[in-house]
UniProtKB/Swiss-Prot annotation:
Organism name: Mus musculus
Gene designation per UniProt: Rlim
Name of the protein described by the UniProt record: E3 ubiquitin-protein ligase RLIM
PROSITE patterns: ZF_RING_2 (PS50089)
Lineage: superkingdom: Eukaryota
Biased composition (Polar residues): 103-131, 140-152, 166-175, 244-255, 333-349
């Protein structure tokens, strides 16, 4: 009987995966058709504003909407959005936060972007109404070249604005299928807080498509395994943007980018619905761990009815990206280079305290190093009559654990340096961080002993949670730290000493690169790319294949010809040349070094 049930479940999953693949292939065909029909002016407009994204991620209607939106200019902010933004600044207690989340959670799929000084950001929240899957993506770009020109006073408002938009976008799509408003708003709040804590963490975990026609799918994703509906492009933003529903902002070269994806899946069973105030959120699993979210509930924690407590799983991923590189997720260049590289080498270790389980791993492929911190957070059931004291403590504990995870992640990155880390050393580091950052009680019942400092640095001062209002105030404001800074080659781990705040731009310094990275070659500028020859598909091009996307040229395709005579789809080679200065096939320089330096 059990075998038949498991077989049925497996067949359903396979069917869902096949449908998802077919849907993506249809969208990919629509993408190429859309690009083929664009005028050269419209193509440049969308390319320069990073609105094309990745083939298969967006529908043709969505791409057309982006084009129309960028032509018309950014829409004026509605009174409701203004009120939401104003209210978010004033939110300092749990009740008002829940009320605010309830008021915006059904607004719809949203995209937010902005720029101030040397920082630009974009955030997108999307929900699949069929599966209940929720994705939130947030990316920040810091232009190091202009870093010294931007004052701290300029950067702080940008940080605050980012947190407000972040909360709004993540909360709006949080729980459309939730059993009750309060049940849905609370996970939304948890999601929002997690997203705020994470600002810049890149994503990508390996999901391979069934056929090799377009390599855009073969990129790592920080998405949990599940049946998915394609989201808007989210990759590095504004340059790496395939799951973001992008709207604008060119990314300056020499920027450091990071990305964060939070994947939340509602799993509300019949008995759970009876427990009215359930945090209806159960994170899907991290593919790198291969552990289902249904197994993530702490064994030490049990509900009154003996059911597994719900959990939230956060996959925080960091990729070290050199300045000037235009990486669409894993990026075309990275995938091409990886063909001749050794397979992944991964170091992983776990720790668990008080029901909060963390898994850390580091992998390297094609010269790109990826750090992953997975946090599984158990959440207790609460009454849907409003926030109780227990709930406030639970949310405080959750925030604390998120910040702790960031501290551990940063320590892992910095202690790793450029050498192979020792698993035993890493484990000791985690244990030390765990002891410093507190042990959140299961479900957040008793968290007063937890320290909210997320820095594992021995010199960092622990941050005590003196009151729930302080923590809420910090989470609402998102973080008012100054602009990210470069401490040079030997930087200490980041310390979170702001009282109750989640410092967005302090996290950015994780990814500001060492001085020797400045010598790495950069891609071509848009002007240099536009100066290369471009032509339309001809009869002689039939049966020829673009070496970047592994797709045959078809009627209407636009091709770009490099000085070495090799040709590619214009949108494929333009993306490649944004991060490389050589031909993908023969590796000859597209421009002489003198010409490159004169423009770059």
């Amino acid at each position: 009987m059990e075998n038949s049930d498991s077989n049925d479940k497996g067949s359903d999953q396979s069917a869902a995966q096949r449908r998802s693949q077919m849907d993506r292939l249809d969208r990919e065909e629509a993408f190429y058709q859309f690009v083929n029909n664009l005028s050269e002016e419209d193509y440049r407009l969308m390319r320069d504003n990073n609105l094309l994204g990745t083939p298969g991620e967006s529908t043709e209607e969505e791409l057309l909407r982006r084009l129309q939106q960028i032509k018309e200019g950014p829409p004026p902010q509605s009174p409701d959005e203004n009120r939401a933004g104003e209210s978010s600044d004033d939110v300092t207690n749990s009740d008002s936060i829940i009320d605010w989340l309830n008021s915006v959670r059904q607004t719809g799929n949203t995209t937010r972007s902005g720029q101030r000084g040397n920082q630009s950001w974009r955030a997108v929240s999307r929900t699949n109404p069929n599966s209940g899957d929720f994705r939130f993506s947030l990316e920040i770009n810091v232009n190091r070249n202009n870093g010294s020109q931007t004052s701290e006073n300029e950067s702080e408002p940008s940080t605050r604005r980012l947190s407000v938009e972040n909360m709004e976008s993540s909360s709006q799509r949080q729980m459309e299928n939730s059993a009750s408003e309060s049940a849905s708003a609370r996970p939304s709040r948890a999601e929002r807080n997690s997203a705020e804590a994470v600002t810049e963490v890149p994503t990508t975990r390996a999901q391979r498509r069934a056929r090799s026609r377009s390599p855009e799918h073969r990129r790592t994703r920080a998405r949990a395994e599940r049946s998915r509906s394609p989201l808007q492009p989210t990759s590095e933003i504004p340059r790496r943007a395939p799951t973001l529903e992008q709207s604008s902002e060119n990314e300056p070269e020499g920027s450091s980018r990071t990305r964060h994806h939070v994947t939340l899946r509602q799993q509300i069973s019949g008995p759970e619905l009876l427990g009215r105030g359930l945090f209806a959120a159960s994170g899907s699993r991290n593919p790198s761990q291969g552990t289902s979210s249904s197994d993530t509930g702490s064994n030490s924690e049990s509900s009154g009815s003996g059911q597994r407590p719900p959990t939230i799983v956060l996959d925080l991923q960091v990729r070290r990206v050199r300045p000037g590189e235009y990486r669409q997720r894993d990026s075309i260049a990275s995938r091409t280079r990886s063909r001749s590289q050794a397979p992944n080498n991964t170091v992983t270790y776990e720790s668990e305290r008080g029901g909060f389980r963390r898994t850390f791993s580091r992998s390297e492929r094609a010269g790109v190093r990826t750090y992953v911190s997975t946090i599984r957070i158990p959440i207790r059931r609460i009454l849907n009559t409003g926030l109780s004291e227990t709930t406030s403590v639970a949310i405080q504990t959750m925030l604390r654990q998120i910040m702790t995870g960031f501290g551990e992640l940063s320590y892992f990155m910095y202690s790793d340096s450029d050498s192979e880390p020792s698993a035993s050393v890493s484990s000791r580091n985690v244990e030390r961080v765990e002891s410093r950052n507190g042990r959140g009680s299961s479900g957040g019942g008793n968290s007063s002993g937890s320290s909210s400092s997320s820095s594992p640095s021995p010199s960092s001062s622990g941050e005590s949670s003196e009151s729930s209002s302080e923590m809420f105030e910090g989470s609402s404001e998102g973080g008012s730290s100054g602009p990210s800074r470069r401490d040079g080659r030997h930087r200490a781990p980041v310390t979170f000493d702001e009282s109750g705040s989640l410092p967005f731009l302090s996290l950015a310094q994780f990814f500001l690169l060492n001085e020797d990275d400045e010598d790495q070659p950069r891609g071509l500028t848009k002007e240099q790319i536009d100066n290369l020859a471009m032509r339309s598909f001809g009869e002689n091009d039939a049966l020829k294949t673009c070496s970047v996307c592994i797709t045959e040229y078809t009627e209407g395709n636009k091709l770009r010809k490099l000085p070495c005579s090799h040709e590619y789809h214009v949108h494929c080679i333009d993306r490649w040349l944004s991060e490389n200065s050589t031909c993908p096939i023969c590796r000859r320089a597209v421009l002489s070094s003198g010409n490159r330096e004169s423009v770059v």
